[in-house]
């Protein structure tokens, strides 16, 4: 303890002194009076639920249409300038991203513009976040593209003898139909989950899982964009090992790369990379980030049109952007059975990304978002949007940061951004028909930088949690090679298994006392902490249930070094030695412990089950062992009490209760008391429901705290010593009477 004596500085020590009884469970219950609770009948609850009042109607409207709450309270003078600047900044970024993410979704670019317009307007009415930017997102777009390419591959045969151009248009039309079907189904799933208040499902997508998944998605997006950057013609792959096939296909065709396309792409790539570094370095001085993507689109379009890159150098361009909005159309519901797995994955991932960013920005600005309403809002955006030929949308991380960072206060900024997209759709779309696809590819790749930076999570999780590192790596690897849909399913299963593993393999500690205090700490962690002679204090930091009850029992015996079976075996061995010495073979066959007439054995330690009810055997503590046999016993620590610290146990199931009853019985057979300390009311209720206290004496084993249990053990031992030193009573007493459990 040298470290405790070095550099000691005299300080005023604050102390507290409390005098109270030792609180066993019965003693504490005598001091407490349960409050009377007014229980409502089912009829009263139904009446209250269906009673219509103006306040209830207003709250329902506020809940399902959040705009009715914040729009009347809009502070025009304070908010309008920020929303105006933010809307313009977000809109000029949303234009190139909408065109680029349509390429990921394997649909014509104009559908990216539709997806940047309709959902944003609808989210303004139904969403609860004031700052996130709704619209196409790289990961979701890639998942949509994977389904579209799987059902409508590049080499599909279009009947009717069409030429190459018409064949491409027919293929794209089929892919749009698939994208609409997936979008509708994912929207229905999100809406139903929101109505059923299933917003909590996002908690199963832990941060390591989401970050590993989005990192793998970034690799998928990167490989998908390579062919546009190099200007090569390759087949688009989806499904298992698609990232490998796509990379190999690009490398095999690299000899056919379009130098002009690569040059334009690299020029834009360098401009964006340097410009983003400039924006980051001088963000405090700039009134708004420089809209680099918009400048890249304008520059790329100007160069392409000026030098006629498409005709002269075969550079692939965006192509025709038809003006005007398409009329509503019904998605093909007959495809649902082919895309339901993808729709579920898209619905969950889209919601997870949205609620994560929404909560981050809400915490920063001091308001709350409703996860269930966010599900409903996304469901409406996707399901109704699919009628207008949009594909699945989510929260865009980069646009959300721009919308918030440029002073956006409400979703009116998003509405303004969508109006800029509407202007392009209705009037100016033809200006961007010469935009090289390599420019859009460079824009997408540069925006993946943040996701690729997530590889830095690995050393962090290596230092902090190997389990979270395992989740990150398994999610990344499975999503990378199995595809994003099956990779996500695999990742969720792995994450749930880690939850089971954490509860099945918790940490077990033997506690000791900090001298002259009521503080009990892990004896392996601190030198000052000492074990109390004759008492073992054992702690678990998890619930006790069917998956870990046997492990808990084994850990107790291993960590404390007190195994009742070994003690019983040592006593039998001592009796045999004593019998051999005195020459009385009958002693060797005598039972060591008898419980209510039953010889100690396997049947005496198991609860009986009759008529589906568990019958626990009465617990009798054998506190004595003949002194003449002690010299034949091995020299070990004399443990008379084991205290189970239940302060970190939040529940115990029927299997755990049975295991606990067996433990109390087994240790009682060898003269060791088992006390339970710090049980929560929930654990006490679990024990009561599972009839652990069928023997009322067992309630004396429960104590309010570890210190109460320690003091109770000391009192019991002192009383036992007094009884042992007292003169024997004058009346006759049966010599082999079985002692009963003394009151603690």
Swiss-Prot record:
Belongs to the SLC26A/SulP transporter (TC 2.A.53) family. Glycans are attached at residues 163, 166. Voltage-sensitive motor protein that drives outer hair cell (OHC) electromotility (eM) and participates in sound amplification in the hearing organ. Converts changes in the transmembrane electric potential into mechanical displacements resulting in the coupling of its expansion to movement of a charged voltage sensor across the lipid membrane. The nature of the voltage sensor is not completely clear, and two models compete. Residues 525-713 form the STAS domain. InterPro entries: S04_transporter_CS, SLC26A/SulP_dom, SLC26A/SulP_fam, STAS_dom, STAS_dom_sf. Salicylate binds at residue 398. The STAS domain mediates dimerization, with both STAS domains latched onto each other in a domain-swapped manner. The N-terminus domain is involved in dimerization such that each N-terminus domain embraces both STAS domains. The STAS domain harbors a unique anion-binding site important for the fine regulation of the high-frequency electromotile properties. The transmembrane domain consists of 14 transmembrane segments organized a 7(+)7 inverted repeat architecture that can be divided into two main helix bundles, the ''core'' domain and the ''gate'' domain. Highly expressed in mature outer hair cells, but not in inner hair cells or other cells of the basilar membrane and the organ of Corti. Keywords: Cell membrane, Cell shape, Glycoprotein, Hearing, Membrane, Motor protein, Transmembrane, Transmembrane helix. This is Prestin. The keyword Amino-acid biosynthesis does not apply. It holds the Pfam family STAS. It comes from Meriones unguiculatus (Mongolian jird). The chain crosses the membrane at residues 80-105, 110-125, 138-147, 179-196, 209-230, 259-282, 292-304, 338-361, 371-388, 397-406, 411-429, 437-455, 470-484, 486-497. Residues 106-109, 148-178, 231-243, 253-258, 305-337, 389-396, 430-436, 485 are extracellular. A motif (Involved in motor function) lies at residues 158-168. The record marks 399 as: Contributes to anion binding. Residues 717-744 are annotated as: Disordered. GO terms for biological process: bicarbonate transport; chloride transport; regulation of cell shape; sensory perception of sound. Residues 505-718 are annotated as: Extended region for STAS domain. It comes from the Eukaryota. GO terms for molecular function: chloride:bicarbonate antiporter activity; protein homodimerization activity; secondary active sulfate transmembrane transporter activity. It is found in: Lateral cell membrane. Residues 244-252 dip into the membrane without crossing it. It catalyses: 2 hydrogencarbonate(in) + chloride(out) = 2 hydrogencarbonate(out) + chloride(in). It is a multi-pass membrane protein.
């Amino acid at each position: 303890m040298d470290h405790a004596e070095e550099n000691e500085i005299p300080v005023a020590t604050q102390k507290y002194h409390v005098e109270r009884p030792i609180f066993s469970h019965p003693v504490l219950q005598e001091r407490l009076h349960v409050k009377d609770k007014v229980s409502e009948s089912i009829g009263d609850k139904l009446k209250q639920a269906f009673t219509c009042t103006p306040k209830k109607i207003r709250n329902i409207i506020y809940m399902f249409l959040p705009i009715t709450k914040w729009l009347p309270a809009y502070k025009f003078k304070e908010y309008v300038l920020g929303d105006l600047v933010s809307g313009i900044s977000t809109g000029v970024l949303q234009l190139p991203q909408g065109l680029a993410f349509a390429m990921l979704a394997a649909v014509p670019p104009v559908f990216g513009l539709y997806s940047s317009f309709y959902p944003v307007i609808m989210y303004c009415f139904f969403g609860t976040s004031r700052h996130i930017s709704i619209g196409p997102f790289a990961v979701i777009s890639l998942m949509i593209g994977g389904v579209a390419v799987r059902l409508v591959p590049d080499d599909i045969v279009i009947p009717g003898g069409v030429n190459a151009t018409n064949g491409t248009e027919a293929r794209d039309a089929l892919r749009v139909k698939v994208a609409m079907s997936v979008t509708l189904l994912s929207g229905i799933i999100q809406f139903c989950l929101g109505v059923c208040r299933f917003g909590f499902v996002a908690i199963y997508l832990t941060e390591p899982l989401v970050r590993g998944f989005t990192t793998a998605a970034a690799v998928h997006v990167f490989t998908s964009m390579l062919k546009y950057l190099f200007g090569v013609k390759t087949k688009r792959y989806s499904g298992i090992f698609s990232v490998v096939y796509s990379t190999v296909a690009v490398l095999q065709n690299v000899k056919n790369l379009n130098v002009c396309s690569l040059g334009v792409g690299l020029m834009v790539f360098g401009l964006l990379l340097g410009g983003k570094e400039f924006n980051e370095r001088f963000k405090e001085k700039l009134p708004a980030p420089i809209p680099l993507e918009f400048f890249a689109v304008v520059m790329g379009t100007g160069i392409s049109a000026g030098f006629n890159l498409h005709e002269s150098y075969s550079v692939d361009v965006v192509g025709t952007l038809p003006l005007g909005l398409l009329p509503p159309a019904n998605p093909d519901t007959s495809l649902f059975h082919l895309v339901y797995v993808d729709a579920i994955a898209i619905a969950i991932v889209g919601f997870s990304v949205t609620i994560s960013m929404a909560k981050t920005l809400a915490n920063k600005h001091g308001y709350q978002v409703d996860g269930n309403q966010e599900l409903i809002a996304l469901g409406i955006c996707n399901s109704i949007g699919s009628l207008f030929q949009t594909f699945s949308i989510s929260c865009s991380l980069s646009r959300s940061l721009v919308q918030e960072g440029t002073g956006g206060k409400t979703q009116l900024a998003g509405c303004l951004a969508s109006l800029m997209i509407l202007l392009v759709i209705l009037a100016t779309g033809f200006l961007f028909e010469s935009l090289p696809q390599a420019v859009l590819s460079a824009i997408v790749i540069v925006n993946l930088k943040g996701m690729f930076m997530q590889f830095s999570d690995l050393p962090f999780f290596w230092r902090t949690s190997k389990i979270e590192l395992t989740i990150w790596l398994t999610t990344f690897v499975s999503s990378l090679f199995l595809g994003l849909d099956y990779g996500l399913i695999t990742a969720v299963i792995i994450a749930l298994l880690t939850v089971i593993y954490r509860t099945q393999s918790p940490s077990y500690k033997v506690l000791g006392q900090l001298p002259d205090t009521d503080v009990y700490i892990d004896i392996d962690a601190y030198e000052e902490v000492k074990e109390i002679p004759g008492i073992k204090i054992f702690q678990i930091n998890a619930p006790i249930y069917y998956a870990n009850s046997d492990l808990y029992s084994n850990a107790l015996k291993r960590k404390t070094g007190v195994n009742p079976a070994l003690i019983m075996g040592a006593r039998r061995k001592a009796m045999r030695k004593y019998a051999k010495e005195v020459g009385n073979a009958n002693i060797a066959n005598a039972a060591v412990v008898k419980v209510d007439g039953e010889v100690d054995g396997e049947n005496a330690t198991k609860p009986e089950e009759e008529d589906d009810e568990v019958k626990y055997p009465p617990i009798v503590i054998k506190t004595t062992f003949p002194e003449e046999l002690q010299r034949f016993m091995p020299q070990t620590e004399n443990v008379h009490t084991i205290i189970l610290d239940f302060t970190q146990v939040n529940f115990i199931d029927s299997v755990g209760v049975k295991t606990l009853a067996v433990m109390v019985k087994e240790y009682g057979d060898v003269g060791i008391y088992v006390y339970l300390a710090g049980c929560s009311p929930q654990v006490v209720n679990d024990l009561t429901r599972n009839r652990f206290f069928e023997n009322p004496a067992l309630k004396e084993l429960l104590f309010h705290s570890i210190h109460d249990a320690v003091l109770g053990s000391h009192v019991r031992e002192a009383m036992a010593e007094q009884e042992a030193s007292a003169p024997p009573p004058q009346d006759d007493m049966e010599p082999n009477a079985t002692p009963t459990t003394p009151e603690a």
